[in-house]
Regions:
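Bacterial N-terminal signal peptides
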Residues: 2-11
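Function-determining sites in protein domains
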Residues: 17-211
């Protein structure tokens, strides 16, 4: 981890840059916006998340994990949504094909409470991380495969799946959120503790002190 710890903060060596280049940029990748927006609208279900991670796979159904603010001082809501059938559909015709979005469906959604303090820390840490991985002026790159799209406080960051450094830690935290939503209630406190530990590691990584 030492060679990738300086992600976005300390001057990179050439070797470190090669080892862990950011795959993310601002907004949607070219030609993905309409698809991504359709899936987001379906999976958000009228909520307004402060943080979300949308997965647009090359095959299979689309999914999202998100945090929705609660009322003053109350727990937030952790949502994990999955399309019932793949939204993106290629329809072959005699002389050409066309894309259709299957949005007339009801996604599978699980909602559980998450402590407000932890949710706010996730929003803050993800904002700091994503603004370093995808600074202003860096647009989301062209993608022909799976697209991951983060949205935090109204700003979208998209690209290929991060496989190292701070980006990989965000995915670890998202996976723990999903585990919390799918697991037993008695195991949630353990998941929250694991997320807190991962956030500590994320802060160390960004500060260049992870070892």
């Amino acid at each position: 981890m030492l060679t990738i710890a300086a992600l976005g903060v300390l001057p990179w060596t050439t070797a470190a840059a090669r080892e862990c280049e950011s795959t993310l940029g601002r907004g949607w990748p070219p030609a993905v916006g309409n698809y991504g927006t359709a899936v987001t609208t379906l999976l958000d279900g009228g909520t307004k998340p402060a943080l979300s991670l949308l997965t647009l796979p090359t095959r299979g159904v689309e999914s999202a994990v998100s945090l929705v603010p609660g009322k003053e001082g109350a727990d937030w809501t952790l949502r994990h949504s999955r399309a019932d059938e793949r939204v993106y559909s290629w329809v072959s015709q005699t002389d050409r094909g066309s894309v259709q979005f299957r949005t007339q469906q009801t996604p599978e959604t699980v909602e559980i409470p998450i402590p407000a303090a932890l949710a706010k820390r996730l929003v803050s840490n993800w904002t700091n991380t994503l603004t370093q991985l995808a600074p202003n002026g860096r647009t989301a790159p062209v993608s022909e495969g799976e697209v991951l799209s983060f949205q935090v406080d109204g700003v979208r960051y998209s690209g290929a799946r991060p496989s190292c450094g701070a980006g990989e830690l965000l995915l670890k935290q998202a996976a723990l959120l999903i585990e919390a939503s799918e697991g037993k209630e008695k195991k949630r406190d353990k998941r929250w503790t694991q997320i807190e530990s991962s956030l500590d590691e994320l802060q160390q990584t960004l500060a260049g002190t992870a070892g």
